[in-house]
């Protein structure tokens, strides 16, 4: 398959962090925010839940400080892996493995370049670029093609592979299957999932 982590890392760093990222938070900060919220919900700590979601400078500073410590302790690949395991990849889909199973009926480790690019593109705006929503498919394909261009620029695929992949209609690549989704299927993280959804 494709180096999914490499593709996701290149996309996240080039497109989300350096590009038109919303909210001003780094990937590590977004991950920290989600982990803090998840932990507060697991602990049934309403005060910690409030502090994990409050829209204040204090919360941002707290996230930045924890992010700095995380970046000292963990590699970028480990942080990315953690983020990808809890990030949203479409309507009620969390984690890259679930997305790979849902959209393409394969494990994330077995994604090809087109599939990996499609999933990477969804992270920009999971509801807007969900490829299963017919009204989204044109925009989703445009985003996928931007990721394919980045993959070629970063050397993950050749220019020829990029051109062929971009000429492949998005709908022709989908092999949709039902997966366990929703808060009841998130195991220990059901409360976190429910909070995020509602």
Residue positions per predicted region:
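Peptidoglycan glycan-strand catalytic modules in the bacterial/periplasmic cell-wall system
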Residues: 1-158
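Non-catalytic structural connector segments
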Residues: 158-198
């Amino acid at each position: 398959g494709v180096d999914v982590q490499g593709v996701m890392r290149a996309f996240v760093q080039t497109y989300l962090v350096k590009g038109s990222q919303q909210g001003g938070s780094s990937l590590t900060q977004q991950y920290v925010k989600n982990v803090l919220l998840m932990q507060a919900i697991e602990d049934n700590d309403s005060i910690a839940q409030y502090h994990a979601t409050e829209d204040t400078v204090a919360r941002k500073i707290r996230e930045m400080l924890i992010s700095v410590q995380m970046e000292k302790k963990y590699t970028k690949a480990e942080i990315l892996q953690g983020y990808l395991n809890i990030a949203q990849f479409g309507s009620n889909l969390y984690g890259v493995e679930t997305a790979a199973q849902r959209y393409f009926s394969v494990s994330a480790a077995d994604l090809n370049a087109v599939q990996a690019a499609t999933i990477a593109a969804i992270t920009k705006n999971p509801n807007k670029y969900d490829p299963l929503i017919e009204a989204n498919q044109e925009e989703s394909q445009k985003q996928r093609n931007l990721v394919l261009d980045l993959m070629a620029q970063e050397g993950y695929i050749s220019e020829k592979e990029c051109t062929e992949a971009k000429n492949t209609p998005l709908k022709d690549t989908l092999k949709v299957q039902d997966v366990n989704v929703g808060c009841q299927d998130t195991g220990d993280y059901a409360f976190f999932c429910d909070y995020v959804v509602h």
